[in-house]
Design a protein with these regions (language model features):
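Aromatic- and charge-enriched surface segment that lines or borders ligand/interaction sites
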Residues: 1-4, 106-150, 162-164, 170-172
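N-terminal lobe/hinge region of extracytoplasmic solute-binding protein
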Residues: 61-111, 142, 213-215
Length: 246
């Protein structure tokens, strides 16, 4: 019995030692893997750079009805998403949420903060090659002020807007309003396309369903029914080669 006891005890001691050796090797291998992965990640961040390839397809899924592509009537998330891709504004918000000039090059105000003068960037064009200028801005604001247009924008009736020149427009407020620049994020429409369209008919006009002339990073190629009953829409867009943002 004593011999058997010594034999079993010796085997158990050896087995315990083997387990400790295996555990040590597992720990060592794990540490090597972690160190190697860390070195690879640091190397990747230091010596590689993310680049973008030309071409390809951009897809975006959004919820909500798509009844219009006219940005002045955009109400659902789908309509607003399409508007941001098709139309430029005087100002927009960048990825960090800061207000940034889009079509606008600069803005100046008087000491009383009742006059704001916006200067447009030079060389702006619509997707058909026609110049985009301050007359388009004034035309759009007049639509916002016109109750017959029934747009989704309000609060412009008390603001006086005048052209200074082809690339400059002045806004005169009845009282000081320091954050006025944040009101200049509305999309601009082309006067040379819509000037003869009555404001009361703009919502139902062909342009509102198929805006063939735009100013954003994309131009419309096709609006397609995604289902047989027309409840889902697919908007096909192509890059706008005349987009001022490149």
């Amino acid at each position: 019995m004593r011999h058997a006891h010594r034999f079993v005890t010796t085997r158990l001691d050896r087995l315990s030692g083997v387990k400790r050796q295996i555990s040590g090797w597992i720990l060592l291998v794990t540490l090597l893997v972690v160190v190697s992965a860390t070195q690879w990640w640091v190397f990747r961040g230091a010596y590689t750079e993310t680049t973008y390839a030309n071409g390809g397809t951009y897809s975006e899924g959004v919820l909500g009805p798509l009844e219009t592509l006219n940005p002045l009537f955009a109400r659902s998330s789908a309509e607003k998403s399409a508007a941001r891709l098709l139309f430029a504004s005087l100002y927009h918000y960048d990825a960090t949420g800061h207000l940034k000039g889009d079509l606008a090059e600069s803005i100046a105000t008087n000491e009383a903060e009742t006059e704001y003068t916006v200067t447009l960037k030079k060389g702006l064009q619509w997707s058909n090659g026609t110049e985009l200028n301050a007359e388009d801005v004034l035309f759009t604001i007049n639509l916002l002020k016109n109750p017959d247009a029934r747009t989704e924008f309000s609060g412009w009736q008390s603001i006086n807007v005048t052209l200074v020149d082809a690339h400059t427009i002045k806004f005169t407020l009845s009282s000081p309003y320091a954050p006025f620049a944040h009101s200049l994020t509305f999309p601009i429409l082309p006067k040379h396309i819509l000037n003869e369209v009555p404001a009361s008919s703009l919502r139902e006009h062909t342009y509102s369903r198929s805006p063939t002339v735009t100013s954003g990073p994309f131009a419309l190629r096709l609006l397609q029914d995604g289902t047989s009953d027309g409840t889902k829409k697919i908007v096909h867009m192509v890059a706008n080669p005349r987009y001022h943002g490149g």
